[in-house]
Amino acid sequence: MATAVGMNIQLLLEAADYLERREREAEHGYASMLPYSKDRDAFKRRNKPKKNSTSSRSTHNEMEKNRRAHLRLCLEKLKGLVPLGPESSRHTTLSLLTKAKLHIKKLEDCDRKAVHQIDQLQREQRHLKRRLEKLGAERTRMDSVGSVVSSERSDSDREELDVDVDVDVDVDVEGTDYLNGDLGWSSSVSDSDERGSMQSLGSDEGYSSATVKRAKLQDGHKAGLGL
């Protein structure tokens, strides 16, 4: 009787201690597990159902078989990803994993080199872009200077062309006067030549008609004489 009362008092003390801890933990914002109790542990062991050892063993065997099948599938996939060489069928699991580890390191090195090369190319691209912008600004400035020079040159060429046209007009006028004089002299000479030709032609025609008349008179005289 005294023993039972003592156990009940001990349980009450543990419960009170637990409640105080929970209140303190609630104030500080964290919680803890229940204090260990032999009676509660014994109660759980008594109420724990007994499992069948045969069914547990079969379940374990089935899980192990599935795990091995999954492992074989993963190893086959790994063989397709890792370069193994001509004797790939003779490789053990350990050698396959070793080669896979080396291949992963090689890929990581290639990845680091690629990242470094990309950074270098990006820096070069930025440098070329700045240089292109600078050249574009210089080209715009040169185009503006060239347009100013071209406009000035066109103005000077236009002035020189006006001067040349004035000189050519003066020369052409003088040449026309000289040509008119030549044409007048040649026309007078041609007129005199034409008049001389007409006179000579008329004299020739008169001479010819007189000769014909004289021949006809001689023929008539001979006929009258009976010759």
UniProtKB/Swiss-Prot annotation:
An example GO biological process term is:
negative regulation of transcription by RNA polymerase II
Q: Which UniProt keywords apply?
A: DNA-binding, Nucleus, Repressor, Transcription, Transcription regulation, Ubl conjugation
- Record flagged with keyword tRNA processing: no
Region Disordered, annotated ranges: 30-66, 142-161, 184-227
GO CC annotation terms, alphabetical:
Mad-Max complex
Name of a matching Pfam family: HLH
Query: Which ranges are annotated Polar residues under compositional bias?
Result: 198-211
**Entry protein name:** Max dimerization protein 1
